[in-house]
Amino acid sequence: MAKAVYVGVDSKARKMKKAYIGIGGTARKVKKMYIGVGGKARLCYSAEADKFGTATPLSKYRTLLAGTTVGGYALFGGGGYDSDARKGEAIMDAYNASLTRTTAASLSVARQGLTAITLGNHALFVGGRNGDTSFGTVDVYDASLTRTTATELSVGRCNSAAAVVGSYALFAGGRKCDFFTLTQSAVDAYNTSLTRTTVTPLPRDSYACAGGTVGGYAVFSGGNYMNTASTIIGTILGSINMVCAYDSSLTSSRAEPLSCKRTGHSAATIGNHLLLAGGYNSTTGKYLSTVESYDASLTRSTAVELSSAKNGLASATVGEYAMFAGGYKGNSDAAYVATVDAYNTALTKTTMPDLSVGRYGLASAVIGDYALFAGGISKIQSTVDKYQDVVDVYSA
């Protein structure tokens, strides 16, 4: 568990986020501090990432939910259940910086497979599906958790990717589910006034791609182009290696492709790097542990591999760490992964304590110094404890 030090500022206790000490005329960051208690050194401060524990569970167990942050809250919205029923929920759970859970206004439409991102003072929950119906709904929450709606997506779809660049949130790709899946290439951009603009589409149809931001670009990578009735991400043919970037004027360009085809991977930004981790390669039929990095000039390199090959993982950036948690690596109960890897700004990897339950289809959100990983599915064969309401908390 990470430790903290507080100092008094204007009669209030303020958490010290960073500490430095002078060595040879150079400021060196302090990673840990100890104090003597009863003749023993006790850790009182740590700037390193660690597992904090668990928070109050979600108000209802579910998978394929979406998470993001607005104001003083981490939000987890929507989600659903098994691939037969494909049932969606409208629940919105909110956690404050003390990890106290409240329930905010429900989504306007119950759905799973939706996408969420923060833009300015708004949290956007976009798209999704319920049964065989896809939605273009855009629910918007402000810092007081008041919900409004914005103009719908140009095409109703689920499993899209999101990224922010400049004053825009972009939603790219996805799939439209109306009894049969139709993969999409559409890209919709919303500005801070929540006005929608439809921009140049992806170079090809893609769902289960990953979106993130680096430098002055919103970047979308990989995904799956197959039109299919399948609901299992990444277990069919069709993964791709495209990388498409949009600048703050919404001009699109192609970047160096991924080193291999991947779908169901996850993206997180740390420092000047956008990390793309895990996924499934349909050409080799393998789950992936590789991690690719794009810098601000969109030059590609590689980072240390994940501790486990997997797709369907979640990611979050908290403090000076990008974390990748959970996932799935095969068709059995034992294939649900609990590993959590953290990368610092130097791309050094630390393997964290495991999630309390191995699972995929979980969502992430950050509040203060905490990264929360919530929900998911943990079994495929058994009907007991199949869906999860657990919220694992990591600190940095």
Annotated model-derived regions:
Residues 2-8, 12-14, 21-25, 35-396:
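Kelch-like beta-propeller repeat domains
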